[in-house]
């Protein structure tokens, strides 16, 4: 997210605590917060999808649900054509 938008979120938050927000500012704050949260969720999802779990013997123990997502995206050499990947 653009640093200017994050600064605006913080500015509106501070103003809300001190003098309060106008109706327009409340709408702007809600929109900016939703945009920030969506970006955060996208980032976490991308990070989790890139994880491959391996046990002490080196065996892939990644949960099947995560493996399926990785197959769909072609991550970690996984492929929809190879159900064992």
Swiss-Prot record:
* Chief place of localization: cytoplasm
Protein localization = Cytoplasm
Q: Where is the composition biased (Basic and acidic residues)?
A: 62-85
| Pfam families documented for this protein | DUF896
Q: Does the keyword Nucleus apply?
A: no
Tell me the keywords, alphabetical order. Cytoplasm
Question: Per the record, which residues fall in region Disordered?
Answer: 58-85
Tell me the domain of life.
Bacteria
Q: Does the keyword Cytoplasm apply?
A: yes
InterPro entries attached to this UniProt entry? DUF896
Gene3D superfamilies according to UniProt? Helix hairpin bin
Family stated for the protein in its record: Belongs to the UPF0291 family.
Q: Which HAMAP family match?
A: UPF0291
Q: What is this protein called?
A: UPF0291 protein SAG0271
